[in-house]
Structures are given as C-alpha cells and as structure tokens.
C-alpha cells in the first residue's frame, strides 16, 4: 500500500557503476555529477544510491562506486561533501576505504572518526615501521642462553612424565599448555622472546628489503628461525634465501603438539582411504554409457558425495607436501654444493702434497740441524790450559756441524789421484758435536795451535782412528796431491807472515767457497791474523839445516825479494832428533 519513493539517481548511478564495465566510464560519471549539481536534493539522492551500490557483492561495482564518489567530491562542492561525511555513508565505508580529503576539515569530523576507528580496530591494515638495528648486549645473550636451557629442561622433564600416562586420556596434560601457547603466540612475537626458543614464525605483512642482507617475504610465509642478530631482528631462511627480518612483521608459531600430529595423521589416513572410492567412481563413469541417468544411479551418487568431502583436505595436504618438497629440494642442493666443495678441496690437497722443508727427509741439508743432531756427540777431555787451545766465540758457531779439521793422516795416506767432486757423505752420529762447543779435530785428543798454516797433528792413541770426512762442497783439482807430495820431500814447512795473511796460500790449491770458509774457523799464527786452513797433507819434519830451493816459490805473484823463506828451527830444536818433540 505504501510504496517507497523511487530514487531518481538509481539508474544513473547503476549505469556509471555497472559490473560489466571494463574500466571507468567518465561519460556516465560526469552525467551523474551534472545531475547532482542541477538538482537541490541531488547530493542526498546520489549518496543514497551509492550506498546501495557499495553493498553489492561484486568488487568491480564497489570500486566504480568509490570512483564515482571521488568524482562527486571533487566536482559538486560542499553539498555533496556533507552527504559523503554523513554517518550512513561512513558506516558503509568502514570495510572498504576512506577519503583522505576530509582529514583536516573539522566540519566533517564523522569521517575522521571513522578513519581512526578503522586504525584502532584493525591495526593490521598497514604494516608497522621497521625497528632500528641495535646490537645485542651480553646480558641479552646470557638471557637467551638461560631461556634455551630452561626450555631444554622443561622438555626433558615432560618426556618421562608423559610416558607412563595411559592412552585413554592423553590430552589432560598436553591440551592445556597447547591452548595457552596458541593464544599467547597468535599475536606478534613478544619483545622478551629469544630466537633460541622459537623455531618458526609466520609473516603478518609483506616485507620488501631496503638494505642488503634483509629477507624478503610475503604475508603468510613460514620462516625458519636461525639466530638472533640484532635487538629486534632475527636471521631466518625462506625458499633457499637467508637474511634478517624484523620481529614486528611476524608472529611466533608453536611447535606441533601430540594432538595436532595425531589429527594430521588421521586426516591423511582418511584422504588416502578414499582413493579406492575415487578410482571406483572413475571406473563407473567411464564404463557406463552416455544415455545413463547419473541421478538415478544411487551408487554413483553416493560415491560422488563421499569423495567430494575430501577435496578441501586434499588441497591442504597438497600445499603441505609441496612446501616439504621445496624444503627437501633446497636441502639436497645445499648438500650437493657442500659435497662438491669438499671433493674439490680433497683433490687439491692430494694434487699438491706437503713437501719437506729442507731436502730429503732422511738427510738434512748442510748448515741445518738434522733430526738426530743433538744425540750421541762425544765430549772433549778436560782442558788443562785454556790459553793453548783455540775456542771460538758462541756467535761464530751458527751451524750444527762443527768445522772439519783438514789435518792429514800422519801415516802418510793420500787420496787417490783424479778429479774429486763435491759430495755429501753421511757422517757417523758421534763424529760431530752440538752448537756452542769447542771444535775438535777428528782425533780424540785436543790439538794445539799450529805455528804455520798447517795444523800440527797429534799422536794417535790407537790404531783404530777415524778418518776425517771432507767438507761438503770442497773441490780439489786433479794432480794437486801428487804435486804437493813431490814438493814436500824437498821443502820444509813455511808460514805466512801476519802482514800477508790475506793472500792466497798457493796458486795451485783450490780455494774454499765463502760458506765453507765461514764454517771452518781458521787457526791464526799471530793475533789479528786469520789464515785459511789448507786441505792437503803437511810436509814432513824439517831437517836441521835449510836447503836451497831449486823449485819456484808457492806464491809466484810475489816479487823475488819478498819470497817466503823456509822455516829454520833453532839449534836446540835441531839437536833433538825426536820428530814428535816438534809438535809439543
């Protein structure tokens, strides 16, 4: 009987916000704006028509209605502003959007109140600001460690208590903590929570990294927590990527309880139990003729309804196992990369084995201590007169092997003629002495300082005397020993004066290399005069009188007036016919 008056703007607003439009039709929108501006009650009627369109279930209709309201607010002046700021229109916008152009106008306070109401009731509409990156203090790390130890102790305490419980009532002690955990962790991660007690978090908002090292994620992603990095930032892993993320963008996920695991297992069993019904339904549908009425067949209908109930569970399981598949794929890729790195390092180490530092392992190079150097060295007899023997300073003994004495064999043994080559002989372990000891000759008794360039030999205590080892690197030209043996039959030993100590002993003798000279401390004939030690046999004991020299001098470079004269012993020494008295 009482029929509501039809709104004149319903058709125009419906035409401008038609759901079949692919985009905004500004021709229809401007027609509505012109009509509102032309009529006195046009603003009120247009807003009422838009409120109806906002209640439409089609999202395109809602978007076109909001665009129409925006166009009216910009083109129709204060009248339409008052209508748009009314409580009826703002209530319709509470779950859609808000118009920011009313924020600073106190006349339209209802719209501002609606905006604040949206912010307070729905805080998750906009993501929060990122917290600052503050370093974790030592107290925070200690607290995190304490929480971890406490959680481990609680888990160990709960396992023995849960074992003797009967299966009939397993949820009495587990359901209450699980419900409390779920209610406590439904919100964002609390400030006091540490990464040691949280294994997974769920993203509440989309996060776009602004700095390198931050983890990108979308709302709903499950992030695996690794460790705490900053005060309000944790490190996590998602889809093979590792980075840090803010805590106010995520919420803590509790570990699944026993009831949840049993529920998931039961759901999976139900889904897999319906596989045979699905296969049977497919078989019936494929074997029946097309003329068969499916609605009249009760078997097909019952099978269809029974299998239709597992569809949401099946979709959930597909998502669950798809995520597990991605996780296992990423784990496999990491394992393959780690195995390849290990194999490459192993091949590199096998291709380049460790080389010994000095020479062969069985023989140490000359001038370096061998592995058995400090063992088994003989010590010299006690010294009766330290002034009569040469004792080098400790700083001069920088080599492990002592200088080899080049005193000849008193029995007159001469090496065979021929070219001699430098060679390394392995001396017996007891023929050398350690560093910083007085050098000794190859004989057992100490040796006096000689009065000529040749060392004075000492008498052998026994016939089993060891022969000296030639030094490493010393070269003796062929024919030198024969030449000198021929000369020593005619000449007595001669010495160099102190002023000519720097001259070479003879042109026919091979000089020692610098290293060999340094490793053989000379025996000076006078203070301050250092003469190299020759490597040949000394001449025999001189006779009582000096004979003329029919042969040229050993130093042909010196003039005839400065030739070296033969040593003339004193008359007292000549009267002594015992040759051994000369060496005392």
UniProtKB/Swiss-Prot annotation:
Topology relative to the membrane: Peripheral membrane protein
Positions of the UniProt region annotated as Disordered: 121-145, 158-193, 354-584
Keywords: Endosome, Membrane, Protein transport, SH3 domain, Transport
Domain UIM residue range list: 143-162
Location(s) in or outside the cell: Endosome membrane
InterPro entries hit by this protein: ENTH_VHS, GAT_dom, SH3-like_dom_sf, SH3_domain, STAM, VHS_dom
Domain annotation VHS: ranges: 16-151
One Gene Ontology CC term in the entry: ESCRT-0 complex
Composition skew (Low complexity), residue ranges: 161-171, 354-378, 475-489, 510-534
Biological processes annotated in GO: protein transport to vacuole involved in ubiquitin-dependent protein catabolic process via the multivesicular body sorting pathway
Composition skew (Polar residues), residue ranges: 172-188, 442-454, 567-584
Residue intervals of the SH3 domain: 196-255
Any matching Pfam family: VHS
Main location: membrane
GO molecular function per UniProt: phosphatidylinositol binding; ubiquitin binding
Bias-annotated ranges (Basic and acidic residues): 132-144
Entries under CDD domains matching the protein: GAT_Hse1, SH3_GRB2_like_C, VHS_HSE1
Family annotation (PROSITE patterns): SH3 (PS50002), VHS (PS50179)
The family this protein is said to belong to: Belongs to the STAM family.
Oligomeric and partner information: Component of the ESCRT-0 complex composed of HSE1 and VPS27.
UniProt function note: Component of the ESCRT-0 complex which is the sorting receptor for ubiquitinated cargo proteins at the multivesicular body (MVB).
This protein's name: Class E vacuolar protein-sorting machinery protein hse1
Species name: Aspergillus fumigatus (strain ATCC MYA-4609 / CBS 101355 / FGSC A1100 / Af293)
Gene: hse1
